[in-house]
């Protein structure tokens, strides 16, 4: 019997992802109704999305889910105040370290899941990041590191001993209006900052007036600046420097009612939602029920915009559903004699273990270990969910159909893990959590940025700090480092954040896995021909109504241990080499032990005849040496094993 190919398993995972995304809309509405979302529904295309089996032509969808403009603003979280990072007890407020006030500790920082935020150890684990909404209708992650550097001078250093770096007013910070760089923040000089260094704000930079330049030429810039700073009481201000109000020239900090802000954030609702229509999303709706089929038989795309409503546009697919041609009825290379579910699962896992056996041979031991651990965790959760799905479904499920569904579920689980751990978005969230953990963490990340501040100016000479181009150069440097620290090999693409990146707030992994199994089963059952053109004939297998969950988990874990013949040969080679080396190192142990045993017997006889203590001492020494050489070989073997393993 033919089985699903890698292409089929990938298509099944894509189908399940789109259908799960459709159901996810309703779950998001229930859990986070105040975070508004947009979505687009259209019939799936075999060319652009995934292969659509003929049996699914009336319900296969491509679903796109994104934050609306207001939803993106509601999800934004800036986690730094003047002197540190926010915690789960920090209330919403503003900083006023420059002429522009900056809000921090927005409700999204710790109120997406308040119960999780209040658990021990989660005090500094922010639940969101800082975003901006672009003209292209994307919720984009911004470079909060540069914003923090511009706005919170205290966080620039750890020891706070470098004069003129952290004991200064902040730069005015604002988002870059350039649509090509929505992630970027721009810094600007202000009068308070220039005054701190004995200069005046002129043409966007900090400069001397023309007559001050003449005086500085005669006295020297350093001497003139010192007298000017004394006259402006700068030194007295530095003795009692307040990082929250670094200059008397700055406006007062805005007063914020954090409780009112939180209540307003929670009270937001999308009045344009059609609840009766969206209720269908969890009931496997057809294209006709969703209104994606026009009266003339054409296909439609349905786009929902929060607080506005629906908009339909016609779309055209050429040959949207083309049945696969049957090329090979026999499929001799893909047969299983034993149709037991355990055999199907074990065969699948062992087949993939060969691939990772090769990876081990060329040096990917860490990859193999991580894959083993991941596979065990997946199987431990997946097989119980598979049984729940089998009991809950109303369709006839055969052994082979369930086995192929299991394979697709493994691939789908790995795709989900990859999204959460390997994507640029996941890396970005991880960095936000690290930066929000401590001030030390912030400084460490600053020191790892490429071409950081010290590459641009000398903090003690102040030679390049005051031209109006300096903040722009600094901003560009941070933006470059922002991309390079996320992924040195990635393209400079905008990092869009989607609601599904926050699925942990809405649903558990077990629930997501269980719901996805039904979609995977539907897709696998609808396939009649695999991507190689082989007939599948899943219905010809025996029906299955239940299975021993514990036994199958054990069978899967044993199969996924990836203990291949290659590993066995490597293990036996190491053991044989160790035994041979140990034997060579202890080649004369037997002869030496025999000599000491002979000496022991002679010393014992002499002691019994002459009753002298000297002979007894010889007897004891010879006996201990003989025993040592008798146990020396096994002792060294097990000692080496303990060190190696």
Curated annotation (Swiss-Prot):
<dbReference type="GO" id="GO:0019058">
    <property type="term" value="P:viral life cycle"/>
</dbReference>
<dbReference type="Pfam" id="PF08404">
    <property type="entry name" value="Baculo_p74_N"/>
</dbReference>
<dbReference type="InterPro" id="IPR007663">
    <property type="entry name" value="Baculo_p74"/>
</dbReference>
<dbReference type="Pfam" id="PF04583">
    <property type="entry name" value="Baculo_p74"/>
</dbReference>
<comment type="similarity">
    <text>Belongs to the baculoviridae p74 family.</text>
</comment>
<dbReference type="InterPro" id="IPR013613">
    <property type="entry name" value="Baculo_p74_N"/>
</dbReference>
<dbReference type="GO" id="GO:0039679">
    <property type="term" value="C:viral occlusion body"/>
</dbReference>
<keyword id="KW-0843">Virulence</keyword>
<comment type="function">
    <text>Essential for virulence of baculovirus occlusion bodies for insect larvae.</text>
</comment>
<protein>
    <recommendedName>
        <fullName>Protein p74</fullName>
    </recommendedName>
</protein>
<keyword id="KW-0842">Viral occlusion body</keyword>
């Amino acid at each position: 019997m033919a089985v699903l190919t890698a292409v089929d398993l990938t298509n099944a995972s894509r189908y399940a992802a789109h259908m799960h995304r459709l159901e996810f809309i309703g779950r998001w509405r229930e859990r986070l109704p105040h975070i508004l979302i947009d979505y687009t529904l259209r019939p799936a295309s075999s060319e652009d999305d995934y292969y659509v089996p003929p049996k699914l032509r009336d319900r296969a969808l491509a679903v796109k889910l994104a934050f609306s403009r207001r939803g993106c603003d509601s999800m934004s979280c800036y986690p730094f105040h003047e002197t540190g990072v926010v915690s789960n007890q920090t209330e919403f407020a503003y900083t006023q370290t420059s002429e522009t006030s900056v809000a921090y500790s927005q409700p999204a920082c710790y109120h997406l899941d308040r119960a999780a935020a209040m658990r021990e150890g989660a005090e500094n684990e922010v639940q969101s990041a800082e975003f901006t909404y672009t003209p292209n209708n994307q919720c984009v992650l911004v470079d909060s590191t540069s914003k923090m550097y511009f706005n919170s001078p205290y966080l620039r250093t750890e020891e706070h001993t470098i004069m003129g770096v952290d004991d200064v007013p902040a730069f005015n910070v604002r988002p870059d209006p350039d649509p090509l760089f929505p992630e970027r923040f721009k810094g600007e000089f202000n009068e308070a900052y220039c005054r701190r260094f004995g200069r005046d704000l002129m043409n966007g930079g900090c400069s001397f007036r023309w007559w001050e330049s003449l005086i500085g030429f005669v006295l020297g810039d350093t001497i003139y600046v010192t007298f000017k700073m004394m006259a402006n009481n700068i030194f007295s201000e530095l003795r009692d420097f307040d990082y929250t109000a670094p200059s008397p020239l700055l406006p007062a900090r805005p007063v914020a009612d954090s409780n009112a802000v939180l209540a307003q954030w929670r009270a937001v609702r999308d009045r344009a939602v059609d609840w009766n229509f969206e209720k269908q999303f969890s009931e496997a709706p057809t294209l006709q029920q969703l209104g994606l089929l026009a009266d003339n038989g054409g296909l439609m795309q349905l786009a929902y915009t929060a607080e506005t409503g629906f908009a339909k546009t016609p779309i055209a697919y050429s040959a949207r559903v083309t049945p696969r041609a049957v090329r090979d009825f026999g499929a001799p290379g893909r047969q299983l004699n034993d149709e037991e579910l355990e055999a199907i699962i074990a065969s699948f896992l062992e087949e993939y273990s060969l691939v990772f056996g090769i990876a081990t041979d060329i040096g990917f031991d860490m990859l193999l270990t991580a894959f083993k651990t991941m596979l065990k965790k997946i199987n431990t959760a997946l097989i119980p969910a598979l049984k729940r799905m089998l009991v809950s479904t109303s369709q006839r499920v055969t052994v082979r159909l369930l086995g192929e569904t299991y394979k697709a579920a493994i691939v789908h689980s790995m795709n989900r893990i990859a999204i959460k751990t390997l994507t640029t978005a996941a890396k970005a969230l991880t960095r936000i959590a690290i930066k929000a953990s401590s001030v030390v963490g912030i400084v460490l990340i600053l020191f790892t940025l490429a071409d950081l501040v010290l590459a641009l100016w000398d903090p003690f000479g102040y030679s390049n700090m005051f031209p109006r181009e300096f903040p722009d150069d600094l901003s560009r440097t941070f933006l470059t480092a922002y991309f390079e620290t996320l992924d040195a090999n990635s393209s400079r693409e905008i990092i869009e954040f989607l609601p599904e990146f926050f699925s942990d707030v809405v649903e558990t992994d077990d629930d997501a896995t269980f719901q996805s199994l039904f979609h995977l089963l539907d897709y696998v059952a609808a396939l009649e021909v695999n991507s190689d053109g082989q007939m599948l004939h899943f219905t010809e297998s025996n029906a299955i109504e239940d299975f021993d969950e514990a036994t199958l988990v054990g069978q899967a874990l044993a199969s996924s241990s990836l203990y291949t013949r290659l590993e066995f040969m490597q293990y036996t080679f190491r053991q044989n080499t160790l035994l041979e080396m140990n034997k060579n190192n202890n080649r004369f142990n037997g002869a030496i032990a025999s000599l000491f045993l002979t000496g022991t017997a002679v010393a014992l006889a002499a002691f019994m005849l002459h009753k002298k203590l000297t002979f007894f001492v010889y007897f004891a020494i010879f006996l201990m040496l003989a025993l040592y050489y008798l146990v020396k070989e096994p002792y060294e073997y097990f000692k080496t094993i303990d060190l190696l393993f």
